[in-house]
Amino acid sequence: MTDSGIRIIKHYDFNEEDFNDPICILGMPGIADIGKFAIDSLIGQLDAKNLMDFIFDDYPAGAIVDDSLLSAPKAEILFWKDPEQKRDIFLITADAQSLTPKGIYRISNFLSEIIFQCKVKLIIALGAYPVNSRKIDSKIPKIYVSSTDRDLLQKFLARTNCNKIQKGVIIGANGLIPTLAKARFNLDGIVLLAETDNIAMVNEDITDLKASITLLEMLKKSFTLPIKKKYSLDNIEDITKNLQNKRDQLEKDLNTFQFVDTEDKRKSLYI
């Protein structure tokens, strides 16, 4: 275990030279789990392999039960090797966010170091942008973008229909990891946030599959990702119900509510 309370479990031994011009896409649990579902979907579509897990002593103090098997809450890095050897992809997600601001800094700082060691040149973080429901286009959610580099931001805006995030705070690891990676290692980062109903900020049971899919489509177009699976508006409701059932079971297993009081929860609206 490291001095920061993080235990590393490696599944592959690798050298930095094993990966070709890699990028990193991350999505941690947050509002409506928009970023996390997008990453989970990418993991399945790319058949990504697990590189390493991280067990952290600031994650919820409970065990996850899946098919009668116990596991600890964790963050994980997976990888996909481009068969054309042009650009490999690292994917990062987690079962939970840290319970304290200090914990979020510790895990974000640690993951930014791992990303740097993997010779990543670009970090793409995915999350939610809560807005009043009356302002949401019912067909396609808008995507808002910010970046650690102004030139990168302008180039991205020029070739997409995304909106700039003028001001605000991106709370949680989705915003902190690319920010720390830029400050410490001069790695470029982009944060893409799909708009969702702001009721999700006070109702943790809400998921927004449409927003997650919109992020996936943007990734596919902007970064030429090999995403083949198509979702239709007709089956979104069924998929959302299945996703919600899994989320409810995970929350029940973790039983986090007894460890976080109402005031702390109000301060921790992770995007």
What is each of the regions a protein language model found here?
Residues M1-R106, F110-C118, N132-I271:
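Accessory terminal and edge-of-domain segments that mediate assembly/interaction
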Residues K121-L122:
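Structural motif
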Residues G127-Y129:
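Short, ordered loop/turn segments at secondary-structure junctions
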